[in-house]
Amino acid sequence: MARDLTYINKLLLRYGIYVYDKDMGNMLTLMEMEIKELYSHGLISKEEYIEAFLILKRRKEG
């Protein structure tokens, strides 16, 4: 299991999505939105979705 934003970046890049914002809070929010969209369209598995959200949650809290 991945434990950092690199996992999420690689996951998003598989679908040609690159997220960058100089404000980390905004960037995490944008990543969250993109992950939700990928999952809602059935492009990523439930496990990938959960893993990504746990990483984002930990990053937002810490």
Report the location of each language-model feature:
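Short, charge-rich amphipathic interface segments used for partner binding and complex assembly
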Residues: N26-G62
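N-terminal acidic leader/helix
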Residues: M1-G25
